[in-house]
Amino acid sequence: MKKGLTLQFASDKLPAHTEIIPVKMRTKTLILTAFVGALGIAGASAQVYSVNAVGYVNKSLPKGFSIVSNPLNSGGNKVSEVFGANPGALTIYQFGDAGFSVNSFDTDFEEWDNGDAVVAPGEGFFVNNAGDAAATVTFVGEVPQGDLSNALPKGFSIRSSQVPQEGKLDSDLGFPTDEAVTVYQYGANGYTISSYDADFEEWDTDDAAGPVVGVAEGFWVLRESATNWTRSFSTSE
């Protein structure tokens, strides 16, 4: 870490790593320029100009299906704002109490079925890239800060970290392990399933420390009861 730039989760410094997705932070008045590859925020170079961290995240969407999330607050977090102009042949599937809602971008008319649909940080959703190759989406907005809360209902939901940070789900990202919980991560080879044993207080991953979640990655959560995924986060501490 250079030039004194640190981020904190509660009273602890964020763990160093990841070089998956570049993130840059900008605001209005120049204070410092720093390299933040050690911040855990996706191995990034950053220019920080004030306490409000505004920046971008580049996310690659493979051909076909993936589960992603919006890692930054962008206005009202409307699909039309988050994905920008002409994002390509994309269809978004958002999961809720009534099942999936489907929202497609029409490349001929250059508009979404519902451009006002909201995809806020903390919500995961499927994206189907119907193009011939992987596409890159650039998310632009503010890093969520303060006392953050993400509702985890009983049963299945699709969620993500509200902070654009890669790390172990519970130890780094503050995911609650108050009961037995199962996490399903979707990739090129299908699902990777990680379960937490509340009696033995460990995950069934090889290191027993739980799954690693990437920046702008969404995943399924299965819980026996509802709770909130809470975290205090600030870029200025």
Residue spans for each PLM region:
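Short, positively charged and aromatic/hydrophobic N-terminal segments
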Residues: 6-8, 13-19
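Intrinsic disorder/low-complexity segments, especially N-terminal tails and targeting/processing regions
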Residues: 22-23, 43
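Short helix-onset patch at the extreme N-terminus, typifying the N->h transition
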Residues: 7-9, 30-33, 52-53
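Bacterial N-terminal signal peptides
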Residues: 33-40
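Extracellular/surface-exposed low-complexity segments
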Residues: 4-7, 43
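Positively charged n-region of N-terminal signal peptides that target proteins for export
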Residues: 2-3, 24-29
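N-terminal exported-region signature
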Residues: 43-237
